[in-house]
Amino acid sequence: MLLFAQPATRIVRLTIDDITRAADGQVFIRFGEPPTPVPEPFATLLLQATTQRDNLQTATNPGARWLFPGRRAGQPLHASHLSQLVRDLGVPALAGRTAALRQLVLQAPAPVVAQALGFTHGTTTRVASEAGTPWSRYASGDHSRWPQPE
């Protein structure tokens, strides 16, 4: 939630198929296209989460593909339950997500962050503007349309 500024509703919809490992060992998570690289130590924790999932011992979920399976058949963990678990750890989820998104748009152009993490361009551009990003003059859009120098 905090590392990639994702809401709990999007996190609980992740499946184990959204977590991949490249031949070189780099771990990726798919929120948008292309998949986003996950830095250590979070990559190791994420891989552990794919193999040590809760609620798989119930009769309703033995083959669940959800990264966070819920107790109901075919359903992921409820987003409010995940949010409560995070709050119980002392982490204010909304404030943390906002801070994470601000940090991300300070490191990369807002349209790049939007595409990689599944946000709208408007959301990341607004957050970038509020954060005083150095990328505020970045020309978003499809740059492949422009003629290439010869």
Where are these regions (language model features)?
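Basic, alpha-helical nucleic-acid-contacting "clamp/cap" segments
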Residues: 21-73
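Short, charged phosphate-coordinating catalytic segments
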Residues: 1-24, 115, 121
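Short, structured motif recognition centered on aromatic/hydrophobic residues
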Residues: 1-3, 9-11, 28, 46-49, ...
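Short, basic (Lys/Arg/His-rich) helix/loop patches that form interaction surfaces
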Residues: 4, 58-61, 79-116, 133-135, ...
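Alpha-helical linker/edge segments of TPR/alpha-solenoid repeat scaffolds
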Residues: 148-150
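Helix-turn-helix DNA-binding helix
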Residues: 124-127
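Alpha-helical DNA-recognition elements
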Residues: 17, 107, 119, 130
